[in-house]
UniProtKB/Swiss-Prot annotation:
Its EC number is 7.6.2.14. Keywords: ATP-binding, Cell inner membrane, Cell membrane, Membrane, Nucleotide-binding, Translocase, Transport. It is found in: Cell inner membrane. The complex is composed of two ATP-binding proteins (SsuB), two transmembrane proteins (SsuC) and a solute-binding protein (SsuA). GO terms for cellular component: plasma membrane. ATP binds at residues 95-102. This is Aliphatic sulfonates import ATP-binding protein SsuB 1. Residues 63-282 form the ABC transporter domain.
Length: 319
């Protein structure tokens, strides 16, 4: 199912830093200079090419976490997290299993509440931030057609809108098919369409491509990136795949033992050239940092405290 907070008007991208980053010159395979910068800056938290320029405006954050901690009983899963997610940006979160990645996503979604600290979400114009989640399991209703799955919660008047979004994900011709007739990648495209038909301001992606084959994952990367640039939503991706994080993110966060251990901007032009020296150097750097850290706390084995979990009745689901 796809969870959402209260709906707010969908607005335009506000993020001068993102536009400036996307305007950087393309990093080509033979650009040894940029690759060397990535290689030699291994001890820094960010690479020089991505640092904020003097006098540049402060980001308009869609999500802000101030001293946020999350505990399940005596176990601390997130510990005093300080984080801002700029509106319109694409942030990828990586880390070992159980480090707190999915817990962070659930907090941002409003599915659970922080044990301490403050988490603020802001929609366009100061309103509420409409949020949708896409999971590894597409969670389609098998007794409804593809079109009906996309239209869930919208009513008959949204048929044209749903068909338009199906066309965007390349599945309009499968509108009357059943989910069982689709491949895994096609089912995830339907799940993506079901989220985007609501025109969310924030799209949360909880390892949505983890069960797909390598070629289908690359195709989905291109689709998600294209739709992100067209729809201008903020995206927060949780993934175990460092290459996926470099391919999609403007910024990569490493969660390690409940804390943000690395905040790495990605100073590469889009679409990302996976074979480039700079791409490979950045991927290698982040991967080495992930492997250097010890195992984190468990996301899955921790008991949930009832007073920290939002009741189901307070969450609006788009299934």
């Amino acid at each position: 199912m796809n969870a959402t907070t209260s709906a707010a008007a969908y607005g335009l991208l506000a993020g001068a830093d993102l536009e400036a980053e996307l305007a950087q010159a393309r990093v080509a395979d033979g650009d040894a200079r940029d690759a060397a910068v990535l290689e030699r800056d291994g001890s820094a938290s960010v690479v020089p090419l991505a640092r904020r320029r003097p006098g540049s405006p402060v980001s308009d954050d869609a999500v802000t976490l101030s001293g946020v901690s999350k505990r399940f009983g005596a176990r601390t899963v997130l510990d005093n997290v300080e984080l801002g997610i700029a509106r319109g940006s694409f942030v990828a979160i990586v880390g070992r299993s159980g480090c707190g990645k999915s817990t962070l996503l659930r907090l941002v979604a409003g599915l659970e509440q922080p044990s301490s600290g403050a988490l603020e979400t802001r929609g366009e114009g100061g309103g509420e931030l409409d949020t949708r989640i896409m999971y590894q399991d597409a969670r389609l209703l098998p007794w409804k057609t593809v079109l009906q799955n996309v239209m869930l919660g919208l009513g008959r008047g949204a048929r044209d809108q749903a068909r338009a979004v199906l066309d965007e994900v390349g599945l309009l011709e499968r509108a009357n098919d059943w989910p069982a007739q689709l491949s895994g990648g096609q089912r995830q495209r339907v799940a993506l369409a079901r989220a985007l038909v609501h025109r969310p301001q924030l799209l949360l992606l909880d390892e949505p491509l983890g069960a797909l084959d390598a070629l289908t994952r690359i195709e989905m990367h291109a689709l998600i990136e294209r739709l992100w640039r067209e729809h201008r939503f903020t995206a927060l991706l949780v993934t175990h795949d460092v290459q996926e994080a470099v391919a999609l993110g403007d910024r990569i966060l490493l969660i390690e033992q409940g804390r943000v251990a690395l905040d790495q901007p990605v100073p590469l032009d889009r679409p990302r050239a996976r074979a480039s020296a700079a791409f490979a150097a950045l991927e290698d750097r982040v991967l080495k940092r992930v492997l250097a850290g010890g195992p984190g706390v468990s996301d899955h084995g921790a008991p949930h405290e009832a007073d920290n979990v939002r009741p189901v009745g307070q969450i609006r689901w788009a299934v």
